[in-house]
Amino acid sequence: MLSFNKGIEEQKNMTYKDIKHNEEVNELLKKGNRNLGLLGYTDHSQAHCVRVAETAAHILKKFGYPEHDIELARIAGYMHDIGNAINRSRHAEYGGLLANEILKQYDLSIPDRITIVSAISNHDESTGGAVDPISAALIIGDKTDVRRSRVREKPKATFDIHDRVNYAVTDQTLKINAEKKVISLNLQIDTDICSMYEYFEIFLQRMLMCRGAADMLGATFKLTANGAKVL
């Protein structure tokens, strides 16, 4: 399979390791996560960003994309939530603007920088969508990160619907079938904590965004909850 950014694989570019050790990126992520904690949101820490980066990379690797594109997905995945340091509203666009300036510090081609910035800017379901394979993999990595450990430590009596939905997920697996071109998210949800209705009230738009992202990759997105096919 040809690289998404054809002809630039030979250039010496920055790496995922470089961006993970970038002080400005990490301070933006820490500040954004602290802000969201005070506003009552679930965890958006570096652990979430690493998970998104690795999932995005795994998806592209399974579908045969070159290492160059996989590395771009890792970088975009790690940086995708830096805009939360400015404001949660339109954080994707803020993140893209911040990333553009940070990436100018590196020996990175203009097409690669724009690809990363575009993926970050389009990852939020309220304003964006998949525009290329890098952004598609990032979206799926981000929107499928539903797990109990993303709920911050607080009394259960104070949980809002977002807390309950994440806390109710007792098991989550994302499977990639490259041969059949299928991306499957399988969830186990404790319905004593959160009803199926509540889950889909919060996550339906995100799951539909995953379906669009899978389509960009020439694949089908399937969602199973408690053994029942949903999408």
Positions of the model-derived regions?
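Acidic/His-rich, divalent-metal-binding segments that scaffold phosphate/diphosphate chemistry
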Residues: 2-91
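Divalent metal-dependent catalytic cores for phosphoryl transfer on phosphate-bearing substrates
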Residues: 37-38, 48, 61-176
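Non-transmembrane, amphipathic alpha-helical segments
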Residues: 41-44, 129, 202
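Terminal helices and disordered tails flanking the catalytic cores of nucleotide-processing hydrolases
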Residues: 3-6, 10, 145-231
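Generic alpha-helical secondary structure signal
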Residues: 23-30, 111-114, 132, 201-204, ...
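Aromatic/hydrophobic pocket-lining residues that form π-stacking "cages" and hydrophobic walls in ligand
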Residues: 56, 137, 210
